[in-house]
Amino acid sequence: MKLISWNVNGLRACLTHGFAESFAALDADIFSVQETKMQPGQADFAPEGYTEYTYSAEKKGYSGTACWCKTAPLAVTTGIGLEQHDHEGRVLTLEYPGFYLVNCYTPNSQDGLKRLDYRMEWELSLIHISEPTRLLS
């Protein structure tokens, strides 16, 4: 199984710079992206043979994760189940027979470490929910 993970820093911008061609050439079974910075329906990207799963931030143009899969997962979960963390579209979990793929976009601590406390709290929360899983992305 071929897994790809890519922080695109804005999927709409990447689509104008060869992302679709790279996606096709890599021919992954599961293609995970982080920092999509978009809401569903904002980009025309529907690769043939793949099913898309997305998790967008409530704030438009911010964060977000997505996966394209050749084989549908058993289950898809968005977020980590904690309201204080689940508004930024950072964690998309796919369950397959024998493994979980956790596609996550970790918060940046920002200049001057303004969000360091939040990031540390977020990481502890992610570790708590991921104990029974194997982090792949």
What do the PLM-derived regions correspond to, one by one?
Residues 1-47, 57, 62:
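N-terminal, active-site-proximal structural segment of metallo-dependent hydrolase catalytic domains
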Residues 12, 74, 136:
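Nucleotide phosphate-binding site architecture
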Residues 20-23, 47-50, 85, 118-119:
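Glycine-rich, phosphate-binding/catalytic loops in enzymes
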Residues 114-126:
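Binuclear metal-dependent hydrolase catalytic cores centered on His/Asp/Glu-rich metal-binding motifs
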Residues 37, 43-111:
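Structured beta-strand-rich core segments of catalytic domains in phosphoester-bond hydrolases
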Residues 127-137:
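Single conserved hydrophobic/aromatic residue that forms the stacking wall/gate
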